[in-house]
């Protein structure tokens, strides 16, 4: 599970892509799950595997990412990796092609649209169930914030309708177990149900929304592994805050879990490797506030006494650090700050970006850079009318 210490650093994306290429080429990894929306990434999955939107090049494909922050996936490094992955796949039989899937929970309305489309083509008698859920959400004009706010004032919600839809789509999809589009529809139903729960809890300021989101991503990993079979091997691309084991940070004190912790707990016997990234200084692509346009921002030298400061003084050059079985050494077992930069970054508040971390328990390996540069976005989008609410911890 190679992760990243920011959502806007060229070296993290570039080297994660190179690392993933080698694992695919040399060790037979068969799918990639990312911190992105399921419907958007399903279009990418079809494209890299040789079906759907084949008239588009990779830049046209990524231009369809519209939800802020678009630069997380619509950037030059992702474009180069996906172009390589498609070329790799098309040289192989259909059954040996590597998939690309979104793990996140945010695509409520897009997922509902995909469910309705699939039911219309495959189970028209079930369309009324989907339309009932759609009509419940209809008054909120595809604005999850309006829906979430309404549940604070009136206890009624769309929970019952969306859960009933999930049960029905699951049942229909099981009848077509080998059908990729049925699996897509079932996963969209899982997204819709969890997204409704996520927004309803988040608007109350409850940090449990973080756990709902990370449980959804871990559950999606499990569903992918089951669907793709026991011989499948998966890579997970997410932020350090999701992949680095929460039990080795102060998140555990606040009752928060994350994907890395859940996958370790569920699949330790199957072989799980959590790989972090870190750097000393450089620049990053991020926004100054939630929902605003991105810009290139400076990343100052690591804070004194942090893990990054220690690595800068001890190494002074890029390195790959693989932690062995004995992790009781003074650095690996020390509680020090570990920098985490999200999609929102304010260098003047740099001290807020350090998470108390026991490095040897949080990761199995760490890729270290002295100097980094900002990602190159493929396009610049104006901010949406109203962006997604921030999660807690913020910015990830």
Task: Go through each PLM region and give its residues.
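Structured catalytic-domain cores with a bias toward divalent-metal coordination
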Residues: 1-396
């Amino acid at each position: 599970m190679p992760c990243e210490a920011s959502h806007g650093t060229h070296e993290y994306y570039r080297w994660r892509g190179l690392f993933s290429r080698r694992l695919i080429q040399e060790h037979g990894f068969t799918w990639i799950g990312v911190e992105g929306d399921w419907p958007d990434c399903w279009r990418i999955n079809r494209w890299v595997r040789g079906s759907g939107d084949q008239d588009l090049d990779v830049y046209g494909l990524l231009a369809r990412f519209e939800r802020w922050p678009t630069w997380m996936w619509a950037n030059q490094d992702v474009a180069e990796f996906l172009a390589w992955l498609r070329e790799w796949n098309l040289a192989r039989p259909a059954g040996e092609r590597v998939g690309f899937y979104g793990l996140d929970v945010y695509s409520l309305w897009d997922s509902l649209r995909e469910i309705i489309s699939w039911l219309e083509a495959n189970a028209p008698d079930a369309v009324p169930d989907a339309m009932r859920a759609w009509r419940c959400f209809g008054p909120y004009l595809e604005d999850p914030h309006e829906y979430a706010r309404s549940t604070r004032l009136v206890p009624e919600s769309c929970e019952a309708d969306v859960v009933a839809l999930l049960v029905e789509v699951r049942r229909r999809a099981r009848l077509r177990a080998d059908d990729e589009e049925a699996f897509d529809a079932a996963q969209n139903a899982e997204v819709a149900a969890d997204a409704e729960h996520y927004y309803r809890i988040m608007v109350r300021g409850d940090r449990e929304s973080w756990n709902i989101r990370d449980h959804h991503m871990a559950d999606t990993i499990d569903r992918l592994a089951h669907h793709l079979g026991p011989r499948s091997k998966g890579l997970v691309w997410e932020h350090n805050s999701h992949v680095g084991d929460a039990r080795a940070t102060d998140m555990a004190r606040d009752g928060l879990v994350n994907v890395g912790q859940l996958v370790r707990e569920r699949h330790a016997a199957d072989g799980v490797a959590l790989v972090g990234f870190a750097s000393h200084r450089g620049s990053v692509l991020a926004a100054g506030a939630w929902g605003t346009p991105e810009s290139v921002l400076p990343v100052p030298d690591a804070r004194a006494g942090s893990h990054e400061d220690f690595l800068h003084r001890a190494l002074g050059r890029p390195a790959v650090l693989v932690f062995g079985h004995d992790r009781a050494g003074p650095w690996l077992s020390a509680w020090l700050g570990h920098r985490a930069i999200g999609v929102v970054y304010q260098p003047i508040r740099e001290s807020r970006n350090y998470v108390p971390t026991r490095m040897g328990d949080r990761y199995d390996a760490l890729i270290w850079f002295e100097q980094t540069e900002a990602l190159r976005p493929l396009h610049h989008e104006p901010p949406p009318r109203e962006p997604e609410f921030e999660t807690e911890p913020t910015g990830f």
